From Swiss-Prot:
InterPro entries: Puta_zinc/iron-chelating_dom (IPR005358), UCP006173 (IPR008228). Belongs to the UPF0260 family. Signal peptide: none annotated. This is UPF0260 protein Plav_0898.
Length: 153
């Protein structure tokens, strides 16, 4: 890419991206893999520190990405067609940022060139969660955390 060329995430709308470009927007933070609670009165989302059983603890990627929707029916499957409902994604999510007209943060792998930058910036769930089978699923309210909602810097 020359200096005159815009990176694809600035040059294209989300709906115009190729499948490879779309997939590369995921920074691997895995915040979308955390169990979320919705307040019945306000609709406000709260995140817990409990993660999906398919999350790979080391890479913070899905261990069965191709089959995730079959294995975990309520898994997040974000597409250009369901972007209207993106408010349930964390504020640091690249898809949400771009949909809101914002740019990618410095630690995003497409900007930094380093996959580890997400973790080093403290934007990943790495080392900060329990798996569903390790947690008391009857005490979800006791597992609510605010760090996934921190906006990107």
């Amino acid at each position: 890419m020359t200096d005159a060329e815009e990176p694809f995430w600035r040059a294209k709308r989300l709906e115009q991206m190729t499948r490879a470009e779309w997939e590369s927007l995921c920074d691997g933070c895995a915040k979308c893999c955390l169990v979320k609670l919705e307040d019945e009165d306000t609709g406000e989302l709260e995140y817990t520190d409990i993660a999906c059983r398919l999350l790979d603890a080391e890479t913070c990627r899905c261990s069965d990405y191709a089959n995730r929707s079959e294995r975990v029916p309520d898994c997040v499957t974000l597409t250009p067609k369901n972007l209207e409902d993106i408010d349930w994604m964390p504020p640091s999510c690249a898809y949400r940022l771009l949909k809101e007209g914002k740019d990618l943060p410095w630690w995003h792998p497409l900007v930094s060139g380093e996959y580890e930058a997400v973790r080093l910036a403290g934007m990943s769930v790495h080392g900060r969660f329990l798996f569903e089978d390790e947690a008391d699923m009857e005490d979800l309210e006791g597992r609510i955390v605010s760090w996934p909602l921190m906006p990107p810097e």
